[in-house]
Regions:
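Hydrophobic helix-and-loop "lid/oligomerization" segment in the mid-to-C-terminal part
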Residues: 7-174
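Alpha-helical scaffolds flanking conserved acidic
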Residues: 1-4
Length: 174
């Protein structure tokens, strides 16, 4: 499980890898079931997973290089993160925010100057919580309102991300 988790979080050791990740992979190599890891890494999608991707694709909005996408209600956390990684495949996108209504927010960044963990922490300050690493982070905003209030909250969250990213970009130009 540890080996698979490290490989998933680092996109098969190609993103955000640290020395500890490599040491753990090396130590666990002979202890883990390589066939099981292959099966897990190459597993097929469930229909529900495909629907989450479909919802995200149909809802995506891109502002400069920032994408926002909605996977629908109660999407599993791992799938939200996977969709967020998928959104980074777009040429126009280098910072991705993907959320599941009433669930989680996943953030990914390909730009060294845009630290996903710091940005989500600042964007959600006072309304929720978030944090993580420079290239990937997650967060949550507790909410029990109706659909109209939820739409307003999502718009507020988008504006917060855009504001924090704009301020971060301006600081990096100094």
């Amino acid at each position: 499980a540890l080996t698979f988790g490290i490989r998933m979080d680092t996109q098969k050791l190609s993103r955000g890898v640290c020395k500890m990740d490599m040491e753990m992979i090396w130590r666990m190599f002979d202890l883990c079931d390589q066939d099981m890891i292959y099966l897990l890494e190459n597993s097929t999608l469930y229909f529900e997973d495909l629907m989450a991707y479909s919802k995200a694709i149909s809802s995506i909005e891109v502002f400069e290089n920032i994408s926002f996408a909605d996977t629908g209600r109660d999407c599993p956390e791992a799938l939200i993160a996977s969709v967020s990684d998928f959104m980074l495949a777009l040429v126009e996108v280098s910072f991705s925010v993907v959320y599941s209504r009433k669930k989680e927010i996943s953030v990914r960044s390909e730009r060294p100057t845009l630290d996903a963990g710091k940005i989500i922490s600042k964007a959600l300050k006072g309304i929720g919580s978030g944090g993580g690493h420079a290239t990937m982070a997650g967060g949550f905003v507790p909410f029990d309102g109706n659909d109209r209030e939820e739409d307003l909250m999502i718009q507020n969250i988008r504006e917060r991300f855009i504001d924090v990213i704009s301020r971060t970009k301006r600081k990096s130009l100094r």
